Amino acid sequence: MRCLQNSAKTLPLAFKSALLPLSQRWFCKFSPKPSSLTNIFKVSISTMANTLNGNVIMTSKPQSTYQVVVAATKEMGIGKDGKLPWNLPTDLKFFKDLTLSTSDSAKKNAVVMGRKTWESIPKKYRPLSGRLNVVLSRSSGFDIANTENVVTCSSIDSALDLLAAPPFSLSIEKVFVIGGGDILREALNKPSCEAIHITEIDTSIDCDTFIPTVDTSAYQPWCSSFPICENGLRFSFTTHVRVKSSSAGEASDESDGSKVLQVDWKKFSSVLPKMIFDRHEEYLYLNLVKEIISNGNLKDDRTGTGTLSKFGCQMKFNLRRNFPLLTTKRVFWRGVVEELLWFISGSTNAKVLQEKGIRIWDGNASRAYLDGIGLTEREEGDLGPVYGFQWRHFGAKYTDMHADYTGQGFDQLLDVINKIKNNPDDRRIIMSAWNPSDLKLMALPPCHMFAQFYVANGELSCQMYQRSADMGLGVPFNIASYSLLTCILAHVCDLVPGDFIHVIGDAHVYKNHVRPLQEQLENPPKPFPVLKINPEKKDIDSFVADDFELIGYDPHKKIDMKMAV
């Protein structure tokens, strides 16, 4: 920035500013609209008057923060010969919508760019309308004195200082750094960078300008769009948010096996543009719960508790960047993992889970419950031919939870893996827990009953049908469980996770869950965590709980809800 040195060293800072000529007071060359000069002078005169009256003491510099907006290839290439080496109209529209979006209609955003980036914008489009354009240049020959809504500065720091102080702090809502290469290399991953909005281009493209990768020890994905194909390129929009001030230090280990980065969750709603904040996928769940509570059908149910119900619902989660473990309340991650591994093992013995401190099946495995449904000869803890048995021994005759069923029935899970590996275009990659001939032997007929898998673009996706969904207690578990299953199968089959589509028949809220769910609805979401799977394990039957590491799970507190049995 072409900054002019302030030589009035002995006066209070605000008083010095009021005495200096206008162009020096903001330390940059800028060209305001004539209509804005009145407001600028009002700010300056007010500052001087309050300082003289002893009402203003400027002891510290305002905090200067910003967000980065960039499109990059997998190799983090962003340009070739000073131009974008791709033509993506959808990306340009996203950039425009993002940088124009404000929550206060009286304010605008600022876009910070290097001189070469400014010059690469066609003249008819510059300055970028509806935004304050801040151009960084140290060249004495660069002059935009007659251009409205443009400020020139010599560095990012000086530009941020300018924008964080009056008068700009009163009219600028958010600051976006948009390029070019040198500017982004300096700005990306700095502690003052609160969010990174990156258009991730899957295709390798010849570039000569590159930027660093996103520091995943300091940032977590907030949201990521499903892949878009345009002009032969596949890309997606991902926003990463800063969850700690630097990459130094270790995340804390939680008792459930997750790793937590210290997240200041309160800031996200104010930091992120609303169009980005609202894209958090947890809102798929929260909005469905809200809709059921507000407009659900009042129905009786098997347990006698009573429900509010809606029929025919769908949620679609993107597994490519993060893992959909709900954050508006704490979900029992260790329970999710151990139960899924229990399913995979084919076990029907609830005591196996009990011994690990997992008691989610206790209600349906108790002596009183089994007697109540007519299974009086069944040993306590024996759930009958439920999920795992159907996955691994479909069609086998069930005796009890102690029998060895090796080689009996049809192993649907191994069949799914074989088809994914050897016939990925098969439309019959299906696993069903619904076996009508065995329903009368089950402690509880399967709720999540049918899963189909789909392979495309090196990704594995899963669509699961759930006939009955307890939105308060069950669904958060179900989302995590089938997302984890999809991630495990992708890992075993050398693919990457794609989508998890959750289709629900009867989606219901129990009457005694309404109040705790309303409490949960008051909690804003936090970033979803990231899942890491032990790369050494490739056999579906070899996994243990320690093979799954959850990074950055920092949910709101646990919310108790009583299980309807």
UniProtKB/Swiss-Prot annotation:
One of its GO terms (molecular function) is dihydrofolate reductase activity. Its EC number is 1.5.1.3, 2.1.1.45. NADP(+) binds at residues 71, 77-83, 115-117, 136-139, 179-186. The keyword Transferase applies. SUPFAM superfamilies: Dihydrofolate reductase-like, Thymidylate synthase/dCMP hydroxymethylase. Transmembrane segments: none annotated. Pathway: Cofactor biosynthesis; tetrahydrofolate biosynthesis; 5,6,7,8-tetrahydrofolate from 7,8-dihydrofolate: step 1/1. Residues 65-242 form the DHFR domain. It catalyses: (6S)-5,6,7,8-tetrahydrofolate + NADP(+) = 7,8-dihydrofolate + NADPH + H(+); dUMP + (6R)-5,10-methylene-5,6,7,8-tetrahydrofolate = 7,8-dihydrofolate + dTMP. GO terms for biological process: 10-formyltetrahydrofolate biosynthetic process; dTMP biosynthetic process; methylation; one-carbon metabolic process. Keywords: Methyltransferase, Multifunctional enzyme, NADP, Nucleotide biosynthesis, One-carbon metabolism, Oxidoreductase, Transferase. The active site is at residue 447. The keyword NADP applies. Residues 245-280 are annotated as: Hinge. Substrate binds at residues 69, 91, 178, 199. Heterodimer or homodimer. Bifunctional enzyme. Involved in de novo dTMP biosynthesis. Key enzyme in folate metabolism. Can play two different roles depending on the source of dihydrofolate: de novo synthesis of tetrahydrofolate or recycling of the dihydrofolate released as one of the end products of the TS catalyzed reaction. Catalyzes an essential reaction for de novo glycine and purine synthesis, DNA precursor synthesis, and for the conversion of dUMP to dTMP. In the N-terminal section; belongs to the dihydrofolate reductase family. This is Bifunctional dihydrofolate reductase-thymidylate synthase 2. The lineage of its organism: Eukaryota, Viridiplantae, Streptophyta, Embryophyta, Tracheophyta. The gene is THY-2.
